[in-house]
Structure formats: structure tokens, C-alpha cells
Amino acid sequence: MAEPQPPSGGLTDEAALSCCSDADPSTKDFLLQQTMLRVKDPKKSLDFYTRVLGMTLIQKCDFPIMKFSLYFLAYEDKNDIPKEKDEKIAWALSRKATLELTHNWGTEDDETQSYHNGNSDPRGFGHIGIAVPDVYSACKRFEELGVKFVKKPDDGKMKGLAFIQDPDGYWIEILNPNKMATLM
């Protein structure tokens, strides 16, 4: 007999839990440290993520032989960033949920260069999410800054959350964690 499915056709809560294992004790100090997005123009991306979303550049790494740079951003106080190079790198790579922007040198000057955001065929990567105290206030500010919206807070069936796009077209969900229970 087939297992009952929720209305969505996805896994039931029980089925989802049955697919999961308890964490091995050896993984107790693991953490999700970063997600990486390739960017065409680091100047535009750094401006967007710092000025528009309020993130802090916590580490920059250049790889001249391979012709690329990494920019790590997080919601951290810039005064907490260590000054000494090795300590700064270790500190940056021990933060939770950082955003790594990878820039392959020269893409900013190539008019044919673009990256797939995963939200059109073939679908894949979807979005990152930013928690904010007030979605409507944040979106009002984004509108004033000329940010491109995929979905405004009152559009569609899921009210109270929004999706914006960064300079490369990646989607960013804007949500209030305390309000999400009414949507899920």
C-alpha cells in the first residue's frame, strides 16, 4: 500500500523524518559556513550587498595565477574583524552563513557574459534568504534604491515576503522569521 501523500504531492512529515539520520557525533562541530555565487562585476555586487543589504565585507582573497577573487560577506561588525592576515582568514571562515562572491577576472568587461540564476529552465539553484525585522519597511527602502523585484510582499498567494534580485539576477528572499509561521 502506498504511503499517504500530503496535498502537495511531496513527502509527509513522517516520511521526511524517516529519510534523516541522527548526526554522527564526529560532525557536532560542523557548520554551514558559506554559499557561493559567481558575479560578473564585483564593484556592482559589493555595492549591492553592502549598501542595499547591509552586509560587511569580512575577507577578500585574490588568486592571481588562476585569475579570480573571492569576497566573503556576512552580517558582522567590521570592528570585530581581526587585523592579522592568518587570524582574519580563520575568523572569516568560521562565521556562520557567509556569502562568498566569486569573480573570474575579465567577466565585467565581457558583454556576452552572464550567470544562470537557477530560476528558469533548466532550474537548479533558487535563492538565498535574508531575515529582516519588517519586510514592508525593507521593501520600501529597496524600492527607493531602485532594486529590482521578482515579487513584492503583497503579490501572489504568499503575502508578507518578497523576492528581489542582485546585479547578476540572483533571487534573494526577504522574510521576517516571526511572520513565516502564518505562511507555512
UniProtKB/Swiss-Prot annotation:
> Residues where S-glutathionyl cysteine occurs?
139
Enzyme kind, highest EC tier = lyase
Which GO molecular function, any one, fits this protein according to its record? zinc ion binding
Q: Which residues form a coiled coil?
A: none
- PTM remark: Glutathionylation at Cys-139 inhibits enzyme activity. Phosphorylated at Thr-107 in the presence of CaMK2. However, this is a consensus site for phosphorylation by CK2 so phosphorylation may be mediated by CK2 rather than CaMK2. Phosphorylation is induced by TNF and suppresses the TNF-induced transcriptional activity of NF-kappa-B.
Give all N6-acetyllysine modified positions.
Answer: 148
* Residue numbers carrying N6-succinyllysine: 88, 148
Give the function comment from the record. Answer: Catalyzes the conversion of hemimercaptal, formed from methylglyoxal and glutathione, to S-lactoylglutathione. Involved in the regulation of TNF-induced transcriptional activity of NF-kappa-B. Required for normal osteoclastogenesis.
Q: Which cysteines are joined by disulfide bonds?
A: 19-20, 61-139
Keywords of this protein's UniProt record, alphabetized?
Acetylation, Disulfide bond, Glutathionylation, Lyase, Metal-binding, Phosphoprotein, Zinc
GO cellular-component terms in the record?
Answer: cytoplasm; cytosol; extracellular exosome; nucleoplasm; plasma membrane
Whichever gene encodes this chain, its name is GLO1
Catalyzed chemical reaction(s): (R)-S-lactoylglutathione = methylglyoxal + glutathione
In this chain, substrate is annotated as bound at 34, 38, 104, 123, 127, 157-158
> Which stretches make up the VOC domain?
31-177
What domain of life? Eukaryota
Active site annotation, chain numbering: 173
Give the pathway: Secondary metabolite metabolism; methylglyoxal degradation; (R)-lactate from methylglyoxal: step 1/2
> Residues where Phosphothreonine occurs?
107
**What is known to happen upon mutating residue 69 to A?**
No effect on phosphorylation
What Pfam families does this protein's entry cite?
A: Glyoxalase
Subunit organization: Homodimer.
Q: How is the cofactor bound?
A: Binds 1 zinc ion per subunit. In the homodimer, two zinc ions are bound between subunits.
- Name of the protein in question: Lactoylglutathione lyase
